[in-house]
Amino acid sequence: MSFISKIRCAFTLGQGVLIENEALKETNDPILFFNNWLKKAQDTGIILPESMSISTCTPEGRPSSRMVLLKEVDSKGFVFFTNYDSRKAHDLEANPFAALLFHWNILQRQVRIEGRVERISTAQSNAYFQSRGRGSRIGAWASHQSQELNDRQTLVERVKYFEEKFAGKEIPLPEFWGGYRVIPESIEFWQGKADRLHDRFVYQPTEKNWTVKRLNP
């Protein structure tokens, strides 16, 4: 960590969450809260601040985690994209719940989201897919994600095959690729403090708004 980053980290540790529990009301919007923190992470220069860990479980309760990129967030939830034949997709089809974790170390902040997961529409998936670079779209077709690969050359040859197949053409959305939305059932914000008496707030949805509670560190 650079000297400037250390100063920034020390300063942030002393801040804590800049709101008190008494000021938090059910109408407070944790999505807005999240977007403010994400923008701060972007402005700080953190590389890929939209990266997040997603944890899934098999029906037998065996967890697995991996890093993915957040591609959209709104009042409905948090959206990411993947191959529907991947391990995480198989987990989600059988056990449609997940936990997300954002960790912005320099800011000493993290956000945890837990919730139910659903596929987004094919139209939404296609809109994002067509916005990707051509190489990424070819890669989506070429990769049998999470399946055993004999050697890298096999993958290279599949890429070449699809480059030739789609040469001069639009690349369609594969049936096995698309997005998921994590619909939050809880959103927890954590702000590190130098004395280790960290600030923690957890939001949970009600029928119309959100409840919010402060948690012990």
Curated annotation (Swiss-Prot):
Pathway(s): Cofactor metabolism; pyridoxal 5'-phosphate salvage; pyridoxal 5'-phosphate from pyridoxamine 5'-phosphate: step 1/1; Cofactor metabolism; pyridoxal 5'-phosphate salvage; pyridoxal 5'-phosphate from pyridoxine 5'-phosphate: step 1/1
Catalytic activity, as annotated: pyridoxamine 5'-phosphate + O2 + H2O = pyridoxal 5'-phosphate + H2O2 + NH4(+); pyridoxine 5'-phosphate + O2 = pyridoxal 5'-phosphate + H2O2
Cofactor: FMN
Top-rank EC class of the record's enzyme: oxidoreductase
BP GO terms, sorted: pyridoxine biosynthetic process
Keywords of this entry: Flavoprotein, FMN, Oxidoreductase, Pyridoxine biosynthesis
Residues annotated for substrate binding in this entry: K71, Y128, R132, S136, R196, L197, H198
GO molecular function: FMN binding; pyridoxamine phosphate oxidase activity
Pfam families for the chain: PNP_phzG_C, PNPOx_N
E.C. code: 1.4.3.5
Binding site for FMN: 66-71, 81-82, 87-88, 110, 145-146, 190, 200
PROSITE patterns recorded: PYRIDOX_OXIDASE
Keyword check for Flavoprotein: yes
Protein family (similarity comment): Belongs to the pyridoxamine 5'-phosphate oxidase family.
Name of the protein in question: Pyridoxine/pyridoxamine 5'-phosphate oxidase
Species in which this protein is naturally found: Psychromonas ingrahamii (strain DSM 17664 / CCUG 51855 / 37)
